[in-house]
Design a protein with these regions (language model features):
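Extracytosolic ligand-binding ectodomains
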Residues: 6-425
């Protein structure tokens, strides 16, 4: 198929699996020349390349297939990038790529046997295949890395799973703390959308409820806010809540599924040029094409963000230089995500190997002979793992706030504080 010819530049096909060339180097020699420590990192990635899809004049790939294929290749680029950095640091790493999508008869060209020996399995990306893969991956004892957003319920009873995309519920504290510290004198408006965001909106509201001593979760008794209920067709009386005599701060957790609310929010703000308005919004706002730069700039739009590259850091630039050498371009979102996830898993597996009961290494040996700080590090994604449920999987809880400032997204903490609001005559 056309996919096979396109993919040849990235990996070679086996009869049953897509097999990336094994990246191996000589066994790592640590500080003691008489001591050789061998660590081999085995990775399996299950990605939707649609390599079994037979393209004909009457059977063309859908837009969704093409998009998933694009994401798969980009993710593979990130995996290869991480593997190259691990190899360059002196470690053995083997990467095997399996086709996620079954053939026209619904038959997968991989089985549980293909997973045996894997330390880490990344993917699948699509819900149907993902659900079927959880038990086989658990049985072979591999860590299961999810690189797409999934329902948290999937983590129940699956301690071997790690979901790398931060759960949205963990950015609520960040927004609340920022408002309490910087906007406690402002007019706070909480624009709700209901629907799929209702649980998250309730969590946010709970943060500000006063306890029996008259304080909320953050020890404050002074902050109150207006609640405006939005719907698919309107943002309620939001326009009436914007005052010319006081800075207004609008908080909305509306996601892509409630894009009409965000569209109406933008329209209301832009039609009122006498009010100073700031906006705290869901991370999805950044991905909506109808949100214009003028709105982002005027409102100093602030979003929870994950995956920001520090382009001024020399170590980061060196790592990206490896990607540029491989692909003659800068890494995009899915390449960054899979690269960082694999490096995080590699470091965790290496430490587990060194400290396992079967290992003869003691703590002093690990600290002196293995300089763990010199391991290749992540580029954009920080990981702060939280076990979601008892005996359940882990979710990344790491978020930072990013503000649109001077026509670009900047880490909020790096931007100078706001001047006090001045009422103009």
């Amino acid at each position: 198929s056309s996919l096979q010819s396109f993919s040849q530049s990235f990996f070679t096909f086996n009869t049953d699996t897509l097999q990336v060339d094994t990246l191996q180097v000589d066994t790592l020699l640590v500080e003691d020349p008489d001591t050789i420590v061998e660590f081999e990192f085995n990775v399996v990635a299950i990605l939707p390349f649609y390599s079994l899809f037979i393209e004909t004049e009457s059977n063309s790939p859908t837009k969704r297939m093409l998009k998933m294929r694009e994401i798969a290749v980009e993710s593979l680029n990130g995996i290869r990038w991480a593997a190259e950095r691990i190899r360059s640091a002196g470690y053995n790493v083997t990467v095997t790529i399996l086709e996620e999508v079954p053939d026209s008869d619904g038959i997968f060209n991989w089985s549980e046997e293909d997973l045996i020996g894997a330390d880490v399995v990344m993917g699948p990306m699509q819900q149907q295949t993902l659900s079927k893969s959880i038990k086989p991956i658990r049985r072979v004892g591999a860590e299961h890395i999810l690189i797409t957003r999934v329902n948290d319920n999937l983590l129940r009873g699956n301690e071997h799973i790690r979901s790398i995309i931060p759960s949205p519920s963990y950015f609520l504290d960040l927004i609340a703390e920022r408002i309490l510290s910087k906007h406690y004198m402002d007019n706070i408006i909480f624009l709700t959308s209901g629907g799929v965001e209702e649980n998250m909106e309730n969590q946010f509201h709970e943060l500000f409820k006063l306890d029996s001593l008259g304080y909320n979760s953050f020890g404050s008794d002074s902050l109150a806010f207006n609640i405006v209920s939005g719907s698919k067709t309107s943002v309620g009386d939001l326009a009436d809540k914007l005052y010319s005599y006081k800075r207004s701060v609008i908080v909305t957790l509306a996601s892509k599924s409630s894009r009409s609310i965000l569209s109406n929010l933008q329209m209301v703000v832009q039609s009122n040029d006498s009010a100073e308005v700031f906006v705290f919004a869901h991370s999805d706002l950044k991905e909506l094409g109808f949100i214009d730069i003028q709105f982002l700039s005027r409102t100093r739009a602030t979003l929870p963000e994950q995956g920001l590259v520090n382009w001024s850091d020399s170590t980061t630039l060196a790592a990206i230089g490896v990607y540029r050498k491989l692909y003659n371009s800068d890494p995009h979102k899915f390449a960054l995500r899979s690269h960082d996830a694999l490096l995080d898993a590699f470091q965790r597996n290496l430490v587990n190997y060194l400290t396992s009961p079967q290992s003869s290494n003691d703590t002093l040996f690990i600290e002196t002979a293995w300089d763990l700080s010199s391991l290749p590090g992540v580029v954009a994604t920080e990981f702060n793992w939280v076990q979601k449920y008892e005996f359940g999987g882990f979710v990344n809880s790491d978020w930072t706030l990013a503000t649109f400032h001077q026509n670009s997204w900047c880490t909020t903490d790096t931007i100078s504080d706001l001047p006090p609001f001045i009422l103009l005559d």
